[in-house]
A protein has these predicted regions:
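Active-site-proximal loop/hinge segments that shape catalytic or ion-binding/gating pockets
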Residues: 421
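Nucleotide phosphate-binding/pyrophosphate-handling subdomain across enzymes
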Residues: 45, 134, 139-144, 152-162, ...
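ATP-dependent carboxylate-amine ligase catalytic core
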Residues: 21-29, 34-44, 70-156, 172-174
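Short internal beta-strands
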Residues: 78, 194-199, 343-345, 364-372
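C-terminal helical cap/extension that packs against the catalytic core
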Residues: 201-211, 216-220, 314-317, 323, ...
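Short Gly/Thr/Asp-enriched flexible loops that form oxyanion-binding sites at enzyme active sites
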Residues: 64, 149-159, 428-429
């Protein structure tokens, strides 16, 4: 089989949440445990950091990996979903897993897949863990797919756990209140393994403290330990300078190409995690920290976080796709000088569409679109729902065509935003 034939088999034969939604969700870890047992329990063959949270876990995971790379560690990175290439999910020192490994793993385990019937995500976890063990990584950063307690990645015993924050997303599976969702995320807290929480939230702090106490795990709330601010920030700048105050070390200036205001919490959480890794014996210098934050994009291939595609007109794309993520984006869009705001927007059909639409600015020009995945909400349906919130514009089902139309309509001093869904963002990157 060719690489493309293997991908076709994996995408079509295994349930994939990113494509079909809840039909791919498994309510226990049985399949993952069975699959990894058949593979020789590769998760026991490398050390790791486990990252969960509603928003920011992707940026956090990439920053941690970048810093550890700069510290000289052979570093694995497992994230999801991918934007353009399936292999983005599995990297070592920034390099994607080779096509040959994906082909070999799939061909060798086809009968096992038929027997166990793993989801697409469970399969990718098995592939990543086997690859990290084979390549003898020093450490791997493992990002959860959804939740924590029942997430397929939750068969590892990491050096450290990190939870970014809690917001409303995947409520059909994780719960309808922040404490309920927090309990699911807190499921990654392991016995005796320290845990960092990037952002203190009144509704969830006690949930995390209780779980950590039950597991006899030390817990650290990053925003209760370290102050962080941005020295200078303009939304169309290629980088920002963050000022991080550690009471034990003084002021540190960290330059990052991740310029969203929401990165303040992520960088602080990353710093708190690195402090704990140092206490565990990992050699991570201040220079490695500075270089890792500054080179996160080039080191790890991270894309789609407040990414500027062009100037005049300014085009910005972001993968934020739930109420919390969209809220951060809107706050930042409001700081950008422009004549007119154009919004190229598409969503998936299992999100709180109304909750997001009611937040969007009514003075923007809209281009309602849909990504090329089965979960995508029909562009016409989205436009109809948006009209109920006073949002009006054109229906252009093709994402690239919608962006092209916005570019034709926009003046050089206008701002075009593309997003609403990870999959919409992926089609213009």
């Amino acid at each position: 089989m060719t690489y493309q034939q293997v991908l076709d088999f994996l995408f079509n034969a295994l349930p994939m949440f990113q494509r079909v939604g809840g039909a791919a969700y498994k309510k226990d870890l049985h399949n993952t445990i069975a699959l990894c047992r058949a593979l020789g329990d590769p998760q026991k063959g490398f050390r790791s950091v486990h990252v969960a949270g509603t928003n920011g876990k992707g940026s956090t995971s990439h920053m941690l990996a970048s810093v550890l790379m700069e510290a000289g560690c052979r570093t694995g990175l497992y994230t999801s979903p991918h934007l353009r290439d399936f292999r983005e999910r599995i990297r070592i020192n920034g390099q994607m897993v080779p096509e040959e490994k994906v082909i070999e793993f799939t061909m060798r385990n086809r009968e096992l897949f038929r027997e166990i019937e793993p989801s697409f995500f469970e399969m990718t976890v098995g592939l990543a863990f086997e690859y990290f063990r084979e390549e003898q990584v020093d450490i791997a950063i493992i990002e959860t797919g959804m939740g924590g307690r029942l997430d397929s990645t939750n068969i590892i015993t990491p050096e450290l756990s990190l939870i970014t924050n809690i917001g409303w997303d995947h409520t059909a599976f994780l719960g309808n209140t922040l404490p309920e969702i927090a309990r699911e995320k807190a499921g990654i807290i392991k016995a005796g393994v320290p845990v960092v929480i990037s952002e203190t939230q009144p509704e969830t702090e006690e949930v995390f403290r209780k779980k950590a106490a039950e597991m006899q795990a030390d817990i650290y709330f990053a925003d209760q330990l370290y102050d962080i601010s941005v020295r200078s920030f303009t939304a169309d700048a290629p980088h920002a300078d963050y000022l991080l105050q550690d009471p034990g070390k003084g002021l540190q200036v960290l330059q990052s190409p991740l310029t969203g205001q929401y990165q303040l919490q992520n960088i602080r959480g990353v710093y708190a995690a690195l402090v704990q890794l140092r206490r565990l014996g990992w050699q991570i210098s201040d220079e490695a920290l500075e270089r890792g934050i500054r080179k996160v994009k080039s080191n790890t291939g991270l894309r789609g976080r407040w990414e500027i595609l062009q100037q005049h007109p300014l085009v910005i794309v972001d993968t934020g796709h739930n109420k919390n993520g969209i809220s951060y984006i809107l706050q930042q869009l409001a700081t950008v000088p422009r004549r007119q705001l154009h919004m190229v927007i598409g969503m998936v059909n299992d999100k709180d569409v109304s909750g997001i639409l009611e937040m969007l600015p009514k003075d923007a020009l809209y281009y309602f679109t849909q990504a090329s995945v089965p979960r995508a909400l029909d562009a016409g349906t989205l436009a109809e729902q948006a009209a109920g919130f006073g949002l009006r514009g054109r229906v252009i089902p093709s994402v690239p065509a919608a962006l092209e139309e916005a570019l034709q309509q926009a003046d050089a001093s206008d701002l075009i935003f593309v997003g609403g869904s990870t999959f919409v963002a992926a089609e213009v990157l």
